[in-house]
């Protein structure tokens, strides 16, 4: 019999329901979590046995959105969901980052978490629901998971923090921050902001962590009622004698190797030391496992770096704790791109370009929460050569998607509004060298490239990555961390912003016990580093260029009456297609009558504007137009007078004498002056060549009526 166990609780303005025991009973654990009609089904499966030769923790987190959740059928030929979207990939990373550090070191059994969105309320984002579900399922599973964790979204509206704001509230919010943590400590922060202060950002983190305690309490209560027995897993006993033997052979040599400042040279020396140590020990005892020896050597490396930092000694590359690596900033490095920059910080380098396009180039995104259009695109590429390796080159991986989104968040707050700068902007960051914080180098490079492209960004932005080494109550915050310091440290803390405030904050913490005080020190130290980098960047370019690149399309905007849109588009788009071909421009029309003409040539744009004005101009009775004969009939001729408008010249209005045959006076395609006599209620236009000719020949004007009377 199905026997569901349910917990309900109020979480801010939402009601959260946790339900287990009803579905997926063959999985290690399964939970259905709902928050006001947004429901996510999360399963966990853990393998009891490890794979032979396994030396890492194979945790996989999959997040998948089903279109039926929003009452939709998927697009595409197959009409079913395909590979994960960028949004799904980012949420999978959001779930993974806070749960991964809560598994004990040495646990290498395969674990898979699958979160499936099965119902969605357009006002409630499924990401927080999925994170709560993953925490609950892992806690119920009996796996050696040191959770549960809670998660919360924090907004900032009217100078007040808002817990789990709705999608509509987020549009008014100056902050979109997601925080996750255990009962005692914050583990992860992901955010974008409209240039808020360090204190405001820290306040949001603390607020979110305090509010999510109710989630942790309810998951604990659910585990008491429905949790599976804890796995009887113990880490392998430490071989103290072997550890001492490895340390005797390698500790001093590894410590010296970490004084080599050049990354490639240092890595080469470390590889030699490790290989020689393992070879020596295996020669002494063939039963020793090379993987086990590698793990011991890694622990010695980690301890060597950390102990030196805590002792106040210089870092791996000789810097003090708050020093920034040498900077080299260049703009306009690529001649035919719309904007470009090369940003180098030590051994990290990014070649960043900015490209301007029209609204037609914007990305249309079909999401579960609703369709939207994105006119600011940010793509981050991390080729293997950037770290001196070979590897596969192809579609972006999870890490590249995540880093690209973080860099985009760093720049988004300073981008101009669409009505002031109606371009689609694409920024691409090519990481050409990497030794720590390439995503923050991308933020700096993007700011420079956008200014070089003439994009009127509100301020320059820069990013910096901070690190932490902590033992007991002793801690040191490091500015501008290297790759090794990231890998061997306890925290990766990335901050982007302008001189005014923070635009993006990302934090991943590998240990418990990160206090508000430590975060405050890190934020203040990051501010000093950010201002230093901005100072160097401003020496290269301190304001957007006065004009966009000569190779970029120039967008000219005019306004027409919405009633005239159909005239410019024409039947089946015939008029606008002809206009595009005739003028060599790109023309886009919005529902409110805004017309955007994009052209790399100013004369072509002026021509297109003139043609549109002709098409949309109201026909004035009594005005003389230059027309072209389009059709000849027995009773007269039809003449086009521009703007797709046509009128009839009756046979009696062709000349000031009797006309027997229209073709005696007019030919197809002939250009003639015509005067508008009348526009009737149905929009039909009566024209006269006779009266137009009389008005354009003043000398003959008095005689023509007299001659006509004489006849």
Curated annotation (Swiss-Prot):
Keywords: Cytoplasm, Magnesium, Metal-binding, Nucleotidyltransferase, RNA-binding, Transferase. Gene3D superfamilies: GHMP Kinase, N-terminal domain, K Homology domain, type 1, Nucleic acid-binding proteins. Its EC number is 2.7.7.8. InterPro entries: ExoRNase_PH_dom1, ExoRNase_PH_dom2, ExoRNase_PH_dom2_sf, KH_dom, KH_dom_type_1, KH_dom_type_1_sf, NA-bd_OB-fold, PNPase. Mg(2+) binds at residues 486, 492. GO terms for biological process: mRNA catabolic process; RNA processing. Its cofactor is Mg(2+). Residues 694-711 have a biased composition (Low complexity). GO terms for molecular function: 3'-5'-RNA exonuclease activity; magnesium ion binding; polyribonucleotide nucleotidyltransferase activity; RNA binding. HAMAP family: PNPase. This is Polyribonucleotide nucleotidyltransferase. It comes from Enterobacter sp. (strain 638).
């Amino acid at each position: 019999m199905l026997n569901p166990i349910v917990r309900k609780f109020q979480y801010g303005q939402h009601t959260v329901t946790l339900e287990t025991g009803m579905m997926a009973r063959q999985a290690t654990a399964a939970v259905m979590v709902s928050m006001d009609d947004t429901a996510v089904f999360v399963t966990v499966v853990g393998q009891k046995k490890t794979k032979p030769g396994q030396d890492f923790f194979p945790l996989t987190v999959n997040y998948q959105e089903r279109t039926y959740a929003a009452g939709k059928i998927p697009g595409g030929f197959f009409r079913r969901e395909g590979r994960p979207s960028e949004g799904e990939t980012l949420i999978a990373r959001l779930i993974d980052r806070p749960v991964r550090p809560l598994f004990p070191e040495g646990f290498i059994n395969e674990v898979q978490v699958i979160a499936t969105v099965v119902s969605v309320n357009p006002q409630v984002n499924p990401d927080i629901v999925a994170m709560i579900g993953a925490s609950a399922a892992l806690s119920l599973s009996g796996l050696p998971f040191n959770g549960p964790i809670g998660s919360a979204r924090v907004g900032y509206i009217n100078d007040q923090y808002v817990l789990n704001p709705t999608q509509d509230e987020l549009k008014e919010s100056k902050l979109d921050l997601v925080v996750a943590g255990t009962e005692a400590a914050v583990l992860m922060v992901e955010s974008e902001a409209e240039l808020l202060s360090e204190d405001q950002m820290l306040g949001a983190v603390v607020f979110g962590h305090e509010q999510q305690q109710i989630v942790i309490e309810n998951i604990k209560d659910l585990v008491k009622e429905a949790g599976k027995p804890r796995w009887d897993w113990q880490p392998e006993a430490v071989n103290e004698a072997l550890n001492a033997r490895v340390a005797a052979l390698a500790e001093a040599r590894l410590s010296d190797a970490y004084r080599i400042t050049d990354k490639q040279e240092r890595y080469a020396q470390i590889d030699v030391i490790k290989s020689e140590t393992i070879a020596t020990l295996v020669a002494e005892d063939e039963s020793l496992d090379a993987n086990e020896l590698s793990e011991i050597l890694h622990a010695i490396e980690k301890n060597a770096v950390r102990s030196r930092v805590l002792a106040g000694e210089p870092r791996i590359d000789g810097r003090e704790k708050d020093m920034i690596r040498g900077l080299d900033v260049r703009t306009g490095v690529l001649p035919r791109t719309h904007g470009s920059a090369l940003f180098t910080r030590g051994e990290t380098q990014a070649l960043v370009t900015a490209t301007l396009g029209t609204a037609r180039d914007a990305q249309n995104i079909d999401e579960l929460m609703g369709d939207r259009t994105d006119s600011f695109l940010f793509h981050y590429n991390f080729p293997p050569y950037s770290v001196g390796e070979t590897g596969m080159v192809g579609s972006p991986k999870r890490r590249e998607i995540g880093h690209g989104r973080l860099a985009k968040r760093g720049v988004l707050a300073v981008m101009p509004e669409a009505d002031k700068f109606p371009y689609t902007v694409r920024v691409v960051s090519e990481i050409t060298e990497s030794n720590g914080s390439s995503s923050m180098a991308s933020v700096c490079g993007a700011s420079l490239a956008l200014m070089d492209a003439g994009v009127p960004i509100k301020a320059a932005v820069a990013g910096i990555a901070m690190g932490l080494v902590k033992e007991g109550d002793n801690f040191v915050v490091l500015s501008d961390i290297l790759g090794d310091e990231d890998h061997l440290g306890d925290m990766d803390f990335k901050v982007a912003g302008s001189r005014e405030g923070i635009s993006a904050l990302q934090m991943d913490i590998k240990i418990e016990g990160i206090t508000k005080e430590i975060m405050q020190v890190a934020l203040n130290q990051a501010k000093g580093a950010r201002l230093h980098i901005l100072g160097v960047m401003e020496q290269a370019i301190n304001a957007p260029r006065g004009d966009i690149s000569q190779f970029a399309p120039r967008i000219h905007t005019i306004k027409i009456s919405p009633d005239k849109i159909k005239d410019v588009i024409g039947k089946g788009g015939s008029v606008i297609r002809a206009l595009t071909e005739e003028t060599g421009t790109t023309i886009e029309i919005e529902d409110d009558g805004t017309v955007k003409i994009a052209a790399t040539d100013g004369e072509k744009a002026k021509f297109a504007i003139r043609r549109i004005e002709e098409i949309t101009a109201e026909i004035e009775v009594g005005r003389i137009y230059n027309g072209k004969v389009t059709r000849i009939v027995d009773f007269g001729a039809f003449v086009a007078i521009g703007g797709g408008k046509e009128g009839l010249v009756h046979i009696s209005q062709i000349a000031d004498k009797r006309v027997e045959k229209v073709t005696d006076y007019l030919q197809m395609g002939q250009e003639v002056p015509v005067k508008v006599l009348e526009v009737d209620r149905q929009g039909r236009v009566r024209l006269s060549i006779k009266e137009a000719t009389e008005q354009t020949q003043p000398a003959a004007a008095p005689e023509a009526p007299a001659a006509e009377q004489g006849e």
